[in-house]
Regions:
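A short, active-site helix/loop in glycosyltransferases that binds the activated sugar's phosphate group
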Residues: 146-173
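A charged, aromatic-enriched C-terminal amphipathic alpha-helix characteristic of glycosyltransferases
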Residues: 340, 344-378
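Nucleotide-activated donor-binding/catalytic signature segment of Leloir-type glycosyltransferases, i.e.
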Residues: 60, 246-269
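Membrane-proximal helix-turn-helix segments that form the acceptor-binding/catalytic region
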Residues: 131-152
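Short hydrophobic beta-strand element within catalytic cores of glycosyltransferases
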Residues: 300-303
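Conserved acidic donor-binding segment of nucleotide-sugar-dependent glycosyltransferases
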Residues: 318-326, 333-340
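Conserved donor-binding/catalytic core segment of Leloir-type glycosyltransferases
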Residues: 9, 196-215, 221-224
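Aromatic "clamp/platform" in nucleotide-sugar-dependent glycosyltransferases that forms part
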Residues: 283
């Protein structure tokens, strides 16, 4: 058993949007509910993580220390994080890299930067030369900080393989802890409505996520146009972009797609409820919870034919080539005309599959075990 006086720090100060916030909220909330929570466990939460923890009524007073603190990228090197992380045996950054000048603690970092393990991806090759060089430089610098970790934690096996192939860390320094559905999706009493209403006059397809390049959202208006021109189907597409992301989209995009704005974790189930199906056209991921969330809400999922989806969803998703809007439109049209409203049995089976895939409580226990084992191993050195 681990010593009672080990001190652990969960660092979520650098997470401000997207799936990283959801994972951190789920992890911290589950830890707060443990009966045998270590007394020496402290948390640094960003404003966004803290706000979402409040939305799910998490009892953050259960931790030995809890502070709202924000860090942003490489500027963290000049922040107070060094002093706040001092005195701990283990520092676990939910998703890195961790930008610290130095640390005496065991440094464990969550890894979810697919650009580092798949540098020659579709997006990179399509970028202008200068932008491509900037991207490569950015992720090279990030990789240097990931290499400083004592251990990395990843969400799927293909990520571990990629890290080893890129020479980031050895296989025995990398742990796999499957991501999972947030417990929010199993607790309807925690769900909150969106601030905008959605018209249900047409078949509705939803995309949940930020507008990162690899999310491939620019494919959506092309799919919509092909559905209309080729198949005679007027389908509404909804996205969850923040104001800056929305204003940066083309007139073609904004004239074709509807935006409900960014959502809190507790609002996402309501968004899924109002969709007839979910689309996930991403080129590149380590892992994304969106496919799991869609299936858990019993929504048909149209997704990129990529390993990061197939490894999780198996035969429960409808797959298309993310580089080809015609294949996506044909797939969606076939579903609408032949399957829509007549596949409840498959959707129910998909939901049951997702719930069994992994669960938030087990994930939190797995993370905590990694921290405790690292502290014990270090104390024996």
């Amino acid at each position: 058993m681990p010593r009672k006086n080990f001190k652990f720090l969960i660092n979520a100060s650098n997470l401000h949007m997207g799936g990283g916030v959801q994972v951190a909220v789920s992890l911290i909330d589950e830890l707060s509910r443990m009966d045998d929570l270590p007394a020496g466990l402290s948390v640094l939460a960003s404003d966004e993580v803290h706000a979402n923890l409040q939305n799910v009524n998490s009892n953050c007073l259960r931790f030995g220390g809890y502070e709202v603190f924000n860090t942003y990228g490489i500027s963290t090197l000049w922040s107070q994080l060094d002093s706040k992380a001092s005195g701990f045996d283990v520092v676990f950054t939910v998703f890195g890299p961790l930008y610290l000048r130095s640390t005496c603690a065991v440094n464990i970092v969550g890894f979810a930067q697919a650009w580092i393990i798949y540098p020659n991806n579709e997006i990179s090759s399509s970028l202008p030369f200068v932008q491509r060089v900037k991207k490569r430089l950015k992720f090279f610098v990030q990789s240097l900080f990931f290499r400083r970790a004592d251990r990395l934690v990843v969400e799927l096996e293909h990520v571990k393989i990629g890290l080893v192939e890129q020479g980031i860390l050895d296989a025995d320094q990398i742990d796999v802890v499957h991501n999972c559905l947030s417990s929010v999706y199993l607790q309807p009493d925690h769900w909150k409505p969106m601030s905008v209403s959605i018209s249900k006059k047409k078949f509705s397809l939803g995309f949940v996520g930020r507008d990162y390049l690899h999310k491939n959202t620019n494919l959506l208006p092309h799919i919509k146009k092909i559905l209309n021109d080729k198949h005679g189907l007027d389908v509404d597409f909804y996205v969850t972009l923040n104001p800056a992301e929305w204003s940066a989209k083309s007139e073609f995009f904004r004239g074709s797609i509807r935006n409900v704005g960014s959502l809190k974790v507790v609002q996402c189930p309501n968004f899924y409820q109002q969709m007839d199906a979910v689309i996930f056209p991403s080129f590149l991921e380590c892992f994304s919870a969106t496919p799991l969330e869609a299936l858990a809400m019993k929504k048909p999922l149209f997704a990129s034919d990529r390993r990061f989806v197939r490894d999780v969803c198996g035969d429960f998703a409808w797959y298309f080539d993310p580089e080809n809007p015609i294949t996506a439109a044909d797939l969606i049209a076939g579903y609408i005309k032949n399957r829509a409203g007549r596949d409840d049995e498959q959707l129910t089976a998909a939901r049951e599959f997702v719930i069994k895939f992994s669960n938030p409580c087990q994930r939190a226990e797995d993370y905590l075990r990694i921290l405790q084992n690292a502290a014990i191993d270090c104390s024996l050195c």
